[in-house]
Structures are given as structure tokens and as C-alpha cells.
């Protein structure tokens, strides 16, 4: 964006939103197979509706007997996810909903394009374009609207799960309109929060009284003023929620998962996909590169685009845009990236250590802007490439 003064809005959804529940199950299935075999091939999709969960897709393990054994564990994995999220309502309960497993072995025709062979490196799992973005407007180098929209829902989930606010239920959405002055976020012009709750007698005002202190707690001081508009459960009662209220599907919240609309998106979803799928791994490394460009002080904001062809190992293109904030030309940054980073699927996986069971935790509250974990989770949020990039210029 070239404008300096404007209002920009992003939304988030909770871990109990039907689509996010499906993302969680798909990534939990992925983690289970990767824990057994780090180079397992997985494309797991989940559908959820009233009293029913259906899991389908493709899985590949080198040991076919283990593959069949693991199929028997899928139902328990799904139920554990539903239980942890907190669904115990009449028409969607972790113990009583029907779980159907339709996973099957990966197509040999897909595998032949991806698998490494003599004289041929591992190819990309599909064609596509992937984007990464970073901005210095928050310490996490994320756009402020999506960062704080996630923070609101994460805090409400905490107080719901620890029993502090027992009337809150899992399904929720947030939306923040953030005012920018001179290109920096300075306040919130409107707050939208819809959350499922237990009691039909509770009004919108009752729910606002519960959630407002937590929303104020996670937003920077001074961002909420007397002019801030509040829309809490604006339709009134929200007792029927989760998959009983709206069907859920894996991969339907790709803007929530990334930058809240503040950056382009290539269209590919993440959850349920192993790291040979560049929809996921290349989007992660694009974020890693953009974040390190900004962390290195080379720009205040940065977009990176990568493109791939199925079965081809190296990216077809590398694109950088610093929106006029760069300390060096974008072409120099592109060349430096090509020098210091192996952007083949294998190179990405090895550099970011992606062949680990680290994906279930990514399914809610954004894949980006999270703190790297000691076990390798969110490795794409590290800034260990910043000095290397500067040295390559």
C-alpha cells in the first residue's frame, strides 16, 4: 500500500470455527503419519457437519503394512481434536459424533513426479504461486490487524478452557479495523466479535461485558477510544454453533491463515499437506525470506513471490517487492535470495526442518507471526538468515 493514512480490516476465526476444526483434524492426521515416517506423503481433507466428521485424501508410507495399521488410528485422532477444542454439545460431541475415514494410498502418478530418482532431485508436488510477507509494524513483523485479531480469539479461548469464562463456547470470529497514520497502526476504529455462548438468555450486552476486558487487554494501550465502534454478537443469540450451525471444510480460511488480506495469496491452502506440497512449504519459506529481509533492515515491508511446476525441483521465478521502503534494489535482494537459499522442495524442508510432527499447532490463530518452538515448530519465523542476506548483497 502506498497510502499513509487509512483504515484496514482483517478477521480471524477461533479454533472451534467449523473450518478451523477441520484444519486441526487434517493437520493432526498429518502429524501422526510424519511422526511414524518423516517423509510420509499426506494430503488429508476433513468435512464436518451435524454429528458427523468425514476424513478423506491420500497417504503414502514406504511400509504398506504400517499404512493399513495407521488407518485404524484416524478416528481416535479426530475425536481427540474435537475434545481438546471443547465440543460437547448435543449435536456435535467428541464422544458420539460419527467419524468416517476415507483416506487411501497416494496415486503412483503423483508420486513419480515428486519422488527423487537417479539423476533427478525431488520435484515440487504441484505447480503454483506462493507469497510471503513481512512488515515492521509489529514486533512479530506481521500486519497489525490480523495479528491482533488472532490475539483476541486466542485470549478468549484461554479463559474459556481454563474455566474463567464458562459460558463461552468454542465457535467464534473476530474482526478489527485498524487506523493507520503515516503508515503506522495507531488505533482501532471498530471491533467485531461473535462468539458462541451457553445460555439463550444472554444478550449481546451480556456477552460484551464478558469479552470486552480481554479484548482491551490484548490491544496496545490507547488503541480503543470513545470513538471505537463495538459490534459484539450483533445478530443476538449465538448458542447453536460449530459444525452443527455451519458445515466445515479444510482449507477455507486461507486469508486468516496468512496475512489477513494485507498481502497477496497464491490460493493454495496449508492444512493436511505434507511439506513436499509447495502450497505449504514454499509459502512458509516465502514468509521466512520476507521476514529476514525486514529483520535485516533492508526494507520496512516486503513481499516475496515464488513459483513452481509439478515435478520440477527449482523455482521458476523469485520476485521481491519492498513498496518503496527498500534500502537496496529489489533485484539485488532477489539475487541474494538465490545465492543463500536452496529453494528446491528438499532444500526448503531441510533448511526449515519441516519433516517433523509440527503442524497441528499451526491450524488455528495463524501460521505466521508465531514464536519458534524448541522442537522445530514455526521454524520459518526465525530471523537467522538476516545477516546472511546482508552479506550476500
UniProtKB/Swiss-Prot annotation:
Catalytic activity: L-methionine + ATP + H2O = S-adenosyl-L-methionine + phosphate + diphosphate
Protein residues bound to L-methionine: 58, 106, 246, 277
Co-factor binding comment: Binds 2 divalent ions per subunit. Binds 1 potassium ion per subunit.
List of residues binding ATP: 17, 171-173, 246, 252-253, 269, 273
Binding residues annotated for Mg(2+), in chain numbering: 19
Keywords: ATP-binding, Cytoplasm, Magnesium, Metal-binding, Nucleotide-binding, One-carbon metabolism, Potassium, Transferase
Binding site for K(+): 45
Places the protein is found: Cytoplasm
Enzyme Commission designation: 2.5.1.6
MF annotations from Gene Ontology: ATP binding; magnesium ion binding; methionine adenosyltransferase activity
Cofactor: Mg(2+); K(+)
NCBIfam families noted in UniProt: metK
Subunit organization: Homotetramer; dimer of dimers.
Protein name: S-adenosylmethionine synthase
Species assigned in the record: Roseobacter denitrificans (strain ATCC 33942 / OCh 114) (Erythrobacter sp. (strain OCh 114))
Amino acid at each position: 500500500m502506498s497510502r499513509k493514512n487509512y483504515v484496514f480490516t482483517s478477521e480471524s476465526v477461533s479454533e472451534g470455527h467449523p473450518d478451523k476444526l477441520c484444519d486441526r483434524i487434517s493437520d493432526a492426521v498429518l502429524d501422526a503419519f510424519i511422526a511414524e515416517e518423516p517423509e510420509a506423503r499426506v494430503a488429508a481433507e476433513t468435512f464436518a457437519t451435524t454429528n458427523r466428521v468425514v476424513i478423506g485424501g491420500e497417504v503414502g508410507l514406504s511400509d504398506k503394512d504400517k499404512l493399513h495399521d495407521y488407518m485404524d488410528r484416524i478416528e481416535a485422532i479426530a475425536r481427540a481434536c474435537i475434545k481438546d477444542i471443547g465440543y460437547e454439545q448435543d449435536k456435535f460431541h467428541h464422544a458420539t459424533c460419527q467419524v468416517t475415514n476415507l483416506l487411501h494410498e497416494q496415486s503412483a502418478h503423483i508420486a513419480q513426479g515428486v519422488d527423487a530418482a537417479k539423476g533427478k532431485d525431488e520435484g515440487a508436488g504441484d505447480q503454483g504461486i506462493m507469497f510471503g510477507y513481512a512488515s515492521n509494524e509489529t514486533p512479530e513483523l506481521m500486519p497489525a490487524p490480523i495479528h491482533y485479531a488472532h490475539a483476541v480469539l486466542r485470549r478468549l479461548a484461554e479463559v474459556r478452557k481454563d474455566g474463567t469464562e464458562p459460558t463461552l463456547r468454542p465457535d467464534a470470529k473476530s474482526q478489527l479495523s485498524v487506523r493507520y497514520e503515516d503508515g503506522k497502526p495507531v488505533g482501532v476504529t471498530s471491533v467485531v466479535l461473535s462468539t458462541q455462548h451457553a445460555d439463550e438468555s444472554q444478550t449481546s450486552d451480556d456477552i460484551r461485558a464478558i469479552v470486552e476486558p480481554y479484548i482491551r487487554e490484548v490491544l496496545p494501550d490507547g488503541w480503543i477510544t470513545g470513538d471505537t465502534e463495538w459490534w459484539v454478537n450483533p445478530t443476538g443469540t449465538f448458542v447453536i454453533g460449530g459444525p452443527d450451525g455451519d458445515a466445515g471444510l479444510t482449507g477455507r480460511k486461507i486469508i486468516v491463515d496468512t496475512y489477513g488480506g494485507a498481502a497477496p495469496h497464491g490460493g493454495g491452502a496449508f492444512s493436511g499437506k505434507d511439506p513436499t506440497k509447495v502450497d505449504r512449504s514454499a509459502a512458509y519459506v516465502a514468509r521466512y525470506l520476507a521476514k529476514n529481509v525486514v529483520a535485516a533492515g533492508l526494507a520496512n515491508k516486503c513481499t516475496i513471490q515464488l513459483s513452481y511446476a509439478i515435478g520440477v525441483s527449482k523455482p521458476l521465478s523469485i520476485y521481491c517487492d519492498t513498496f518503496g521502503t527498500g534500502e537496496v534494489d529489489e533485484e539485488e535482494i532477489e539475487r541474494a535470495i538465490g545465492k543463500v537459499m536452496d529453494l528446491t522442495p528438499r532444500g526448503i524442508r531441510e533448511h526449515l526442518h519441516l519433516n517433523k510432527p509440527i503442524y497441528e499447532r499451526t491450524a488455528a490463530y495463524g501460521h505466521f507471526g508465531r514464536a519458534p518452538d524448541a522442537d522445530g515448530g514455526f521454524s520459518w519465523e526465525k530471523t537467522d538468515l538476516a545477516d546472511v542476506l546482508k552479506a550476500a548483497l
